[in-house]
């Protein structure tokens, strides 16, 4: 799989999805800033600048991929919004934006499940040739402070997850490190687990 590095601090999820779309439809989804920003501007959970998982799934579906969304909690939440200089009213508006994207995804027939899942389930989907857009504490993978980010998980081989980190590139992550990145998303960042299963 070809790597594409995000060009903005806000386009990590968009860049991760772009790599998946390019892998399936390289002519229609070239790895460039125009397509990265197309995804971002069509998925931004306004007024915040992060992408909505439901909007990302919609974009993938419109591009011809089979999509399935699993979230620990359906409603949008941003516990450390004050550190990003957002106001509570802006987070409430982002919750509404998220609901609109979720409604549109349901109308398009995208399965949306609200439940917990494990890395074992992620592995099973990888064995079935799926790509997984997965939210983790990327700080563990990047050896930095905790940060909630989406990465594209493309394979599990001999005890290692092969991921495309839109900031770092392709990485081989040992199982224990991936488990830490998965678990500390909840314990350190207070964010729910989320994934889009792409085929």
Label each region the model flagged:
Residues 37, 67-68, 132, 151, ...:
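A broad, low-specificity signal marking well-ordered, structured residues that form hydrophobic/aromatic
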Residues 61-100:
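A basic- and aromatic-enriched beta-loop-alpha substructure that forms the phosphate/nucleotide-
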Residues 1-70, 124-128:
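Active-site nucleophile-adjacent alpha helix/oxyanion-hole segment immediately C-terminal to the catalytic cysteine
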